[in-house]
């Protein structure tokens, strides 16, 4: 009765109006699962391949019909007959069927859509919530959210090099309260921006994209919003930055060229100067987490940054690790970064995603489950965050349904868990010594 009988993919749209995949899996019993695949804007060089059609006459070349066909005509016939509960077996079978190191033949988007749909169908078959199916009986930790309320870099047209300015309500007693705090700060920030005559349009991830006078202006405005909402910066609510440094690193000159986003007169920094600048920000503001502070291929820079700041701030590898255990293992061995960002579509299966989270935890690194800038209404990452007791999630601002869908799912899970639910707040930053 738990045998897979049908697999079907279709092309749908993501939050940017670009095509992506939706996959459905059915079993003999009638159990059903559906998975939708996200897409990134600032993508790591070593990410698994997102298969696009390349036909400029259709969706500007971004169509996903090839990936859809790979699901319907190649993957389906290989996994029909599998027990839907055999997640690892199905994921490994698809990896073998693809046969490339980066899933470039079938497409990570095709494989991931099936992987998610299989897990959801198995949960449906067993009549349990997805987080419970994936995580087992000890599933209980609600993640501390990193809420991206200012969008810069490749996520907006704002002239700021850093891609995300986040609030982290680590002082809240529950996830529900953390979400409330975040929403109140978001609205306080909007009011402040309006009073300054700045734009309140939002970027890809639901955060505002105003024309600030540089990074410090952005951080200080967020601090004012935290205080205006009635909270204490550095006690109730902390700040996080996603530098997305690979987006403005000049590999030929070996410099971090802020002029790419901030225009003429902006800083151009060496690796050493970039580290000095990040340390200056950490010493000046209540920053608890920095993502991709160095370029994805600047291993010496990452090691130096970690040696300098690794005890007092979370240093998250996104483009640096691309949710890949091979890169994470190297980072652990070389003491580079102290945290990994987890994006399911960077690697392409749930099995490999869980492997990366487990490896990080065993090494004392934190794992931050994350959305992509091109999202859908699929809320699987909320269930993954709870299933793995990861402790942290990054899923955008307090606007746009593609972001709110994940927050609302976490509210449901917290309700379902009842008294068992734990919100660890600052304790979820167990990689820090301060």
Curated annotation (Swiss-Prot):
Entry EC number(s): 4.2.1.11
Protein residues bound to (2R)-2-phosphoglycerate: 163, 343, 372-373, 394
SMART domains: Enolase_C, Enolase_N
UniProt pathway annotation: Carbohydrate degradation; glycolysis; pyruvate from D-glyceraldehyde 3-phosphate: step 4/5
UniProt cross-references to Gene3D superfamilies, sorted A to Z: Enolase-like C-terminal domain (3.20.20.120), Enolase-like, N-terminal domain (3.30.390.10)
Gene Ontology CC, one term: cell surface
Amino-acid positions noted as binding Mg(2+) in the UniProt annotation, renumbered to this chain: 242, 291, 318
Cofactor binding comment, as recorded: Binds a second Mg(2+) ion via substrate during catalysis.
Active site (record annotation): 205, 343
HAMAP family: Enolase
Family note: Belongs to the enolase family.
Protein name: Enolase
Record organism: Streptococcus thermophilus (strain ATCC BAA-250 / LMG 18311)
Gene name per UniProt: eno
């Amino acid at each position: 009765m738990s045998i897979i009988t049908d697999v079907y993919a279709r092309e749908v749209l993501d939050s940017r109006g670009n095509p992506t995949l939706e996959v459905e899996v059915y079993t003999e019993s009638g159990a059903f699962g559906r998975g939708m695949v996200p897409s990134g804007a600032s993508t790591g060089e070593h990410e698994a391949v997102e298969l696009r059609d390349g036909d400029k006459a259709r969706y500007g070349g971004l169509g996903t019909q090839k990936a859809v066909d790979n699901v319907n005509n190649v993957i389906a016939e290989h996994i029909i007959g599998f027990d839907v509960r055999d997640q690892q077996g199905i994921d490994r079978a698809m990896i073998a069927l693809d046969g490339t190191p980066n899933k470039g033949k079938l497409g990570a988007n095709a494989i991931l859509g099936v992987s998610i749909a299989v897990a959801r169908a198995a949960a449906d078959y067993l009549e349990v919530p997805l987080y419970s199916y994936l995580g087992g009986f000890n599933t209980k930790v609600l993640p501390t959210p990193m809420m991206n309320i200012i969008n810069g870099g490749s996520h907006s047209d704002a002239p700021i090099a850093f891609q995300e300015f986040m609030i982290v309500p680590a002082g809240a007693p529950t996830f529900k309260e953390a979400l409330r705090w975040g929403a109140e700060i978001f609205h306080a920030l909007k009011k402040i921006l309006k009073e300054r005559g700045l734009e309140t349009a939002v970027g890809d991830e639901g955060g505002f994209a105003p024309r600030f006078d540089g990074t410090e202006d952005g951080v200080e405005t967020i601090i004012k919003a935290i205080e205006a909402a009635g909270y204490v910066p550095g006690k109730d609510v902390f700040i996080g930055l996603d530098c997305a440094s690979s987006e403005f690193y000049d590999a030929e000159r070996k410099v971090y060229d802020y002029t790419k986003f901030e225009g003429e007169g902006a800083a151009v920094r060496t690796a050493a100067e970039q580290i000095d600048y990040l340390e200056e920000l950490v010493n000046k503001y209540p920053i608890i987490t920095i993502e991709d502070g160095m370029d994805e291929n600047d291993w010496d820079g990452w090691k130096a940054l970690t040696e300098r700041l690794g005890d007092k701030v979370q240093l998250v590898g996104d483009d640096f690790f691309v949710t890949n255990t091979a890169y994470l293992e190297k980072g652990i061995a070389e003491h580079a970064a102290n945290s990994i960002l987890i994006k399911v579509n960077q690697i392409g299966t749930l099995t490999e995603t869980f492997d990366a989270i487990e490896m990080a935890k065993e090494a004392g690194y934190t794992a931050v489950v994350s959305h992509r800038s091109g999202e859908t209404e699929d809320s699987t990452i909320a269930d993954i965050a709870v299933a793995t007791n990861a402790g942290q999630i990054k899923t955008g601002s307090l606007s746009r349904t593609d972001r709110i869908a994940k927050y609302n799912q976490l509210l449901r899970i917290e309700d379902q868990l009842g008294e068992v639910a734990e919100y660890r707040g600052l304790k979820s930053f167990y990689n820090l010594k301060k």
